[in-house]
């Protein structure tokens, strides 16, 4: 009977020692893993933050470049007709968007939705304005209408997208 008690004492103390060692080592390894993940997040942030800022800059440029007053200055030619200008505006907005479509992986889904909404709204706006002008009149007539009506618009989608973009940039700091 003493032998069984001795075996039980050693077994129980061995099991307790094993369990204590196991939990201490598990805790130590878990802490090291948490620290490693934390360091990886810091390193990833150091790499991604400049890339994200570049994406935000490019989206600001995109939104500013597709504003009617900006496109009028860049695109209009002296002998151009309104119908040709209409097509060039549409083409320019689409090209600018396609050039910046990859930026969506660096910004929030909400911001990207605002950018798309701004683009789509502008395309619709350009089409609507061009319907009010005959295709064969000088392009300057369409340009005037675009700028006048755009300036009359309360909270243009491009401006809303820019506000959302700027607010998202502030969350990076």
Model-derived segments and their meaning:
Residues 1-3:
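N-terminal hydrophobic targeting signals that begin at the initiator methionine
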Residues 5, 9, 14, 18-22, ...:
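Conserved non-transmembrane functional hotspots
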């Amino acid at each position: 009977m003493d032998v069984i008690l001795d075996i039980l004492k050693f077994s129980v103390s061995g099991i307790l020692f094993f369990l204590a060692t196991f939990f201490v080592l598990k805790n130590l390894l878990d802490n090291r893993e948490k620290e490693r993940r934390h360091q990886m997040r810091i390193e990833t942030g150091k790499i991604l933050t400049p890339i994200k800022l570049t994406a935000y800059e490019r989206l600001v440029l995109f939104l500013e470049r597709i504003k009617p007053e900006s496109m009028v200055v860049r695109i209009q030619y002296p002998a151009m007709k309104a119908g040709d200008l209409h097509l060039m505006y549409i083409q320019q907005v689409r090209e600018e968007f396609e050039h910046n479509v990859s930026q969506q992986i660096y910004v929030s889904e909400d911001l990207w939705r605002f950018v798309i909404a701004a683009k789509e709204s502008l395309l619709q706006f350009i089409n609507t304005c061009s319907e009010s002008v005959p295709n064969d009149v000088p392009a300057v007539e369409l340009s005037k209408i675009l700028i006048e009506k755009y300036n009359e618009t309360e909270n243009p989608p491009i401006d809303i997208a820019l506000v959302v973009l700027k607010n998202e940039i502030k969350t990076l700091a």
